[in-house]
Design a protein with these regions (language model features):
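Helix-loop boundary and gating motifs at the non-cytosolic
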Residues: 1-48, 207-246
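Juxtamembrane intracellular "pre-TM" segments in multi-pass secondary transporters
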Residues: 1-2, 176-212, 396-397
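Helix-loop junctions at membrane interfaces in 12-TM secondary transporters
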Residues: 2-5, 86-99, 289-300
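Intracellular juxtamembrane helix-capping segments at the cytosolic ends
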Residues: 26, 107-122, 310-324
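Helix-to-loop junctions at the C-terminal end of transmembrane segments
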Residues: 53-67, 150-151, 256-270, 355
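Structural signature of the two symmetry-related core transmembrane helices
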Residues: 70-84, 163, 272-287
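Cytoplasmic helix-loop-helix junction between adjacent transmembrane helices
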Residues: 99-135
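Symmetry-related core transmembrane helices of the 12-TM Major Facilitator Superfamily/SLC fold
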Residues: 157-175, 362-380
Length: 401
């Protein structure tokens, strides 16, 4: 592992650690602070909706400035201030403001970090998966550490922990190589207008729109599993400790696939990875909809390597090969917004009423999303021939931080 890939691995690990601590316990922490379920839902939904505007704008500005590292430092600093404020916020309005700011800012870093990681993996010839895998490993570690801390000290420990981990995130981004001071020349307003114009050209590409819809439906199909999967398992009589064993099985499959991602990509290709990820979605969620026996659930958990990891790798390498480096952060932000924001948000909103009405059969909606993703993946395989999608797509790959 060279110096650049090592620094990126540290940044990915810090990012995964904060996610692993936040995801399972932040909703419970909000309840501990006295927020009602409706307030919690509104707060989390507001964060998702704001990401739709903030993440693409952050990506466009980072591309126009040709400085993704600086944008990540700004966003992580805002997130740190938000989580730090939660240690003292007792009024609902202040909790809303601080939590949403932290959620939106930390979420805006992810596509920027991915764009840098994927692009530099090509420039410095290392395996992107060997860097990205540390986010998955540290996410699992964050689950464990936060669980131990909450069990021992109560939910009140979460906000201080998140604040401390955000310091690690800021430090890990600061440790990345700084871009040359004179790299982005010319008037910023002119560069910003030029980036917007190229982004519009990208969004007029039918191939890119098919990709966005395909990848977003795949990732959005995880909404019921992420939001209500644990609750449904509890309703089936599974203990918290058993659920704690089942959940990481999917992460183990994800880690295994990420560790050999370059070989997988060379053999299968980006578009076929998206297709296989969609097939895994159809199979996984259809089986889960019928409440199979525990051994079957355990086996199906390993399909997370297909439903998430294959689709994610396919998306990352599609963007790498189809989008010019100067638009990398913009494309990554659009992908993140459509998948983690719009598709995941709408599917999460639908999951609650569907679960109340149909129980575990609500997984069939996720299966239908996977089927739509499969159709779009097949269209992508026919329409995309492996090249750049914009008129000015041919440019030298440069070490863009």
């Amino acid at each position: 592992m060279n110096t650049v890939s090592f620094r990126l691995a540290l940044a990915q690990a810090a990012s995964g650690l904060i996610g692993g601590m936040y995801t399972p316990f932040f909703g419970a922490w909000l309840g501990w602070k006295g927020l009602s379920p409706s307030h919690i839902g509104a707060l989390l939904a507001a964060g998702m909706l704001l990401r739709v505007a903030v993440a693409p704008m952050g990506g466009v500005i980072a591309d126009a400035r040709d400085d993704r590292r600086g944008a990540m430092l700004v966003f992580y600093t805002i997130a740190f201030c938000g989580y730090a404020a939660l240690n003292w916020a007792d009024i609902t309005a202040l909790i809303f403001a601080a939590a949403i700011a932290a959620n939106v800012a930390s979420g805006a870093v992810t596509p920027l970090l991915e764009s840098v990681s994927v692009r530099l993996s090509e420039v410095f010839r290392f395996d992107y998966g060997h860097v990205r895998v540390w986010a998955s490993i540290s996410f699992m570690l964050g689950n464990v550490l936060a669980g131990i801390a909450v069990s021992r000290f109560g939910l009140g420990v979460l906000a201080p922990w998140l604040s401390v981990v955000l310091i690690l995130n800021v430090a890990s981004i600061y440790a990345l190589p700084a871009p040359p001071a004179n790299r982005a020349r010319g008037d910023f307003a002119l560069r910003l207008r030029a980036t917007f114009a190229e982004a519009r050209e990208l969004l007029r590409s039918k191939v890119f729109l098919v990709f966005l819809a395909c990848a977003s439906l795949d990732q959005g199909s995880h909404a019921f599993y992420y939001s209500l999967g644990g609750l449904h398992w509890r309703a089936l009589g599974y203990s918290g400790s058993l659920i704690g064993i089942l959940w990481p099985l999917g992460l183990l499959a994800e880690i295994a696939l990420m560790s050999m991602s370059l070989h997988v990509l060379r053999v299968i290709g980006a578009a076929r990875l998206l297709m296989l990820g969609a097939c895994a979605c159809v199979l996984r969620w259809t089986v889960m909809a019928f409440d199979p026996p525990l051994p079957v659930i355990a086996l199906v958990q390993f399909l997370h390597g297909g439903t998430f990891a294959m689709a994610h790798l396919g998306a990352m390498y599609f963007i790498l090969k189809s989008v010019p480096p100067r638009l990398a952060a913009t494309a990554q932000s659009l992908y993140a917004v459509c998948s983690s924001g719009i598709a995941m948000g709408l599917a999460t909103l639908a999951s609650g009423p569907l679960y109340a009405a149909y129980g575990g059969r609500a997984y069939l909606l996720m299966s239908a999303m996977g089927l739509c993703s499969l159709v779009l993946a097949l269209m992508l395989m026919r329409r995309w021939h492996g090249g750049r999608l914009t008129a000015h797509g041919e440019e030298e790959a440069v070490a863009t931080i």
